[in-house]
Amino acid sequence: PPPSTTCGHSGDHTPPPPPSTTCVRTSFFHVRSLSKIRPYLTRKAACSVAVSLVLSRLDYCNSLLAGLPQMQIKRLQAVQNAAARVVTRSRKTDHITPILKQLHWLPVAERVKHKVLSLAFRAVRENRPAYLTDLIRLYCPSRSLRSADQSLLAVPGPRVVKTKRYGQRAFSYIATILWNALPRNIRETNSISSFRSSLKTFLFSQ
């Protein structure tokens, strides 16, 4: 299928761009602005501002970040960490993981997985959007195997995964690998709301 221009997918073999320097710079600007008015805000209000001005930027088209080197993800994680510390008025020496869990904020890498898997769920369970349903398919072995009824996806062959640099970032590949790694009870969830809730709990436990 032709490459899509939506945020869900930019073509199955198109490598995603690195995190935008402008996005990181703008997000840090909003974090600094929030820190200046934080003494006058309740924690709930500060959290709402951070979600609206900072996390929304980190989440925009974040499915395209799947498969990027960890060093590039760290730039975005630094933004989220700074926002979390401002909201909770934590010190730089405080460990960030409990702070993020306290706010119910998944780390950036897990937010990317959450977005990719949510798109995969819609493709598998709701047969939409069409440009994604064409890229993944349920695993149907030729012989009767126990794995046949476990809602697994078929891993793309070497023709799709052409190179380590690009092919493994393709939605058809990375969504399949992430999906098959989920516990069976999450894969077999029927509603998107239940799936997202269970998925978030699972990702927090990793």
Model regions and ranges:
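Hydrophobic/basic alpha-helical segments
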Residues: 1-206
